[in-house]
Amino acid sequence: MPLFIATGPGPYPSHRELHPAFYGCFDWHSCVEMEWVVIRLLRLFPGDVPLDRARETLGGLLTPRNIATEIAFFNNPNHRSVERPYGWAWLLTLQHELEIWNDEDGARWAAAVRPLADLLCANLIAWLPKLTYPQRMGMHGNTAFSLLRSLDLAERRAGEGEPDLLSAIRTAGFRFFAQDTEYPAQYEPSGADFLSAALSEAELMSRLLDPARFPAWLDAFLPGLAESQPASLFTPAIGGDETDGQIAHLTGLNLSRATSFVRLAEALPAGDVRTPALLDAASRHARVSLPAVTGGDYMVEHWLAAYASLLLGP
């Protein structure tokens, strides 16, 4: 399915004209992801980032004028489903990163981006009740992953007296996933996955459920974790041709799995019998794909750093 569908005669604007804040990468959501990576590294490891160049670049992108153009794009009725929900969720992730960063530039950029984040929050709130079924896949449409990526900002907004997004996420999460049992994770992965549908759902529910209820839910959902079962879920994915954009997704699957394994272990009580298997799997998956974050083909490099950065923690 094309990213843009012609509804009239050309000429058509360039990607940079449509998206002056998020352009220059393979697609819009990858631009958002990689700008988030730079912001995250500036916040966590400022001494290891080319500081002046990073700030200058972000400062030229994240301006009120550029964000107004982005808003105009998403306000166009023809674009109402573009980047839904994956790109929306990554934009909310970027906004959250800016807001928790104690930095003068970060505060200015957060103020600039917030109107776009507010629009996509409102769009997500309006869309979730219409979603009859969740999408359980290992790619961009995965519902659980996008809810998870949106959750940090939703919780922050709720703490500021704006609970609507958090309420929408919780309602959707419980409606779609709370009753799930014996998930067939033995059929993962598919040949173009960069997410685990099973682990994305489990990680989301680790955030939504009461900590006392989550261990039992997880046992019913994925009953073999203590024994590293199903084996296909605990075995790092084997990629192949990194110049093929679909096959290249499998390199990222290992990192997204590693992150989920760690988060699940953190959500379980001390001494839980599943924790050693989860942490061992996280380590093995990360070792396979971390070397590909830099120095590889563009079809991997243009997005993989985002999934490596998720491993850094909250």
Language model features by range: what are they?
Residues H15-V32, A72-A89, K130-A144, Y183-A198, ...:
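Solvent-exposed loop and edge beta-strand segments that line ligand/cofactor-binding
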Residues D48-R65, E104-W127, E160-D180, R213-A226, ...:
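Extended, well-ordered alpha-helical scaffold segments
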Residues W101-E104, L208-S228, L233-P314:
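Terminal, non-catalytic domain-edge segments
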Residues L120-E201:
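Loop-centered beta-sheet repeat module
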